[in-house]
Amino acid sequence: ANINLVTGAHYVPQIIEALDMARRNGLDIPVVYNSSGYEKTETLKLLEGYVDIYLPDLKYLDPELAQKFSYAPDYVQAAKAAIGEMVRQTGKCEFGEDGYIRKGTIVRHLILPGHTGNSIKALRYLHETYGEDIYISIMNQYTPVRKFVEFKELNRKVTKREYEKVLDAAVDMGIQNGFIQEGETASESFIPDFD
């Protein structure tokens, strides 16, 4: 069991207040902060001592891709700083006797079709910077939900060959603390119905 906060930056004061109250009343399970990685370090510093596990994304290591797909030319700089703050707070990943993570940072990276170079750069940066102190989740679940006119390369799923290329690079880098996806994960059945 855990408390999973998803994209909660705009509620940090309320989160802190609620967690203080819950802990006074006996809350004793890990708090997980699930994030795009595009966070201000000032906000994350407020969460020190409140969050046990950070789950940020590192979407891009190429500022041009960050601008092209997310209109965020500062994404790389912001995400690097945010992940650095998260790891500073949590330290090396720790697991309980049950095998579940109790403390640490797991960085997720979603491979985009046609952009394995970005993925390999992202993995290299994470591994060279944090080594085995973090876990890296290498995801192949990109699912196009509509046809893009402006981004034609995003109109398809990641191929098996692309995913294997990134996984092979991770192995060659010596990444040991990681998660991979097997089977068919790029399907609309994995996307919540928001209607």
Language-model-detected regions and their locations in the chain:
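Conserved beta-strand termini and adjacent loop/short-helix elements that scaffold enzyme active sites
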Residues: 139, 180-183
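Conserved beta-strand segments of alpha/beta enzyme cores
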Residues: 135, 176-179
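Conserved N-terminal glycine/acidic-rich loop preference
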Residues: 96-99, 105, 147-177
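Conserved AdoMet/S-adenosylmethionine-binding subsite of the radical SAM
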Residues: 1-152
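Radical SAM enzyme core and accessory elements
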Residues: 182-195
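General structural signal for secondary-structure boundaries
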Residues: 40, 75, 156-159, 195
